[in-house]
């Protein structure tokens, strides 16, 4: 199913994970009226606010922003090289490793991982994640944005990294 957003908001999935390796995809179907995505994709804990602010603004979420291609957490950002911007028609890939003491997250757009990294080999992660129970999350700054999330309920557009569960379930 697709979801269209009419106000600034963040949406969290309803299944959380605190251990394991997971992969999911979000396809941005359309952008807001200003022509930019204003979208963020990533993971958040249940403490991350919804409906009032973008996730990534607090320590409870890790979000890749499609407008500027930066990773947000706790109100600050990391700028990967190259930046990973995305817009209408793009598929955002998220791989999360919650198995070891060091929790890791990777992002990719349209089949290309950040900095040409490879989650299956455990190198090149974009961010180290604090321990906790995480939910897949999507947020938007502008009305009129729609997206389609795939948490494993159908085949993925891109290859699931080696050793990762195909989906969030």
Predicted regions, residues:
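PRY/SPRY (B30.2) beta-sandwich protein-interaction domains
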Residues: 1-169
């Amino acid at each position: 199913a697709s979801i269209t957003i009419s106000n600034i908001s963040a949406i969290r999935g309803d299944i959380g994970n605190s251990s394991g390796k997971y992969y999911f995809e979000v396809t941005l179907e359309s952008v807001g009226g200003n022509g930019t995505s204003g979208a963020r994709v990533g993971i958040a804990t249940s403490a991350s606010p919804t409906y009032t602010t973008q996730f990534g603004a607090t320590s409870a979420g890790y979000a890749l922003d499609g407008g500027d291609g930066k990773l947000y957490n706790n109100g600050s950002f990391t700028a990967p090289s190259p930046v990973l911007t995305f817009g209408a028609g793009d598929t955002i890939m998220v791989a999360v490793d919650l198995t070891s003491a060091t929790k890791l997250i990777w992002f990719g757009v349209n089949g290309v991982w950040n900095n040409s990294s490879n989650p299956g080999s455990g190198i090149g992660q974009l961010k180290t994640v604090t321990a906790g129970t995480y939910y897949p999350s999507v947020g938007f700054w502008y009305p009129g944005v729609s997206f389609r999330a795939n948490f494993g309920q159908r085949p993925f557009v891109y290859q699931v990294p080696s050793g990762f569960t195909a989906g969030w379930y």
